[in-house]
């Protein structure tokens, strides 16, 4: 797999306080990586480093030449007094044709939202629009900062299924940031546990049993994860992430989220 971004012994200090300590991280094409950690662990700072928005105190970051990064922020702040449709919001991302805007929305199952008021969207609808905006760049790397914030549980499952589908469709790398792993883990290739330094990293199965992860999140999180993996009813999804009628099935004894589909 081609390496898109490599962080080598990254350190970031704020007023003599070390926020990131000797971070080593590699993001490769086609992989979904989930960065987890409690509030204040340095996750947002690490995202800024990857996006090139945060200077380093020491260390080195290597980016593939010409890499395109699509970013979905944790929060979207809009001026409530200014009317803004989804279509107009997407046009703010650059010079794209009407067809390109419609295609981006179609890919995320949001084509029907094109004329909707941005201020009146639900949490899940907002995330789909933000994802569509990121896809307009045809990114090599998609960075999502707490993408499920403000989205209900079923909406989270649908959102992560959609991200997984888009990864398979475009072959891009995905970096997801979260403080809660009980849903995202089923769709992740690699997990990185952060508490200013990398506490542990590896496959979802190994991290769920790792002492550092259990110390950070507790056994209850692992139990919730196991329930999601083995007992939920899931649907096959089309490219937009919407369920295909008549193809629902129940998972009883296997985890289906860890295989890469080429």
Curated annotation (Swiss-Prot):
Its EC number is 7.2.2.20. PROSITE patterns: ABC_TRANSPORTER_2 (PS50893), ZNUC (PS51298). SMART domains: AAA. Gene3D superfamilies: P-loop containing nucleotide triphosphate hydrolases (3.40.50.300). Residues 5-220 form the ABC transporter domain. It comes from the Bacteria. Part of the ABC transporter complex ZnuABC involved in zinc import. Responsible for energy coupling to the transport system. This is Zinc import ATP-binding protein ZnuC. It comes from Vibrio cholerae serotype O1 (strain ATCC 39315 / El Tor Inaba N16961). The lineage of its organism: Bacteria, Pseudomonadati, Pseudomonadota, Gammaproteobacteria, Vibrionales.
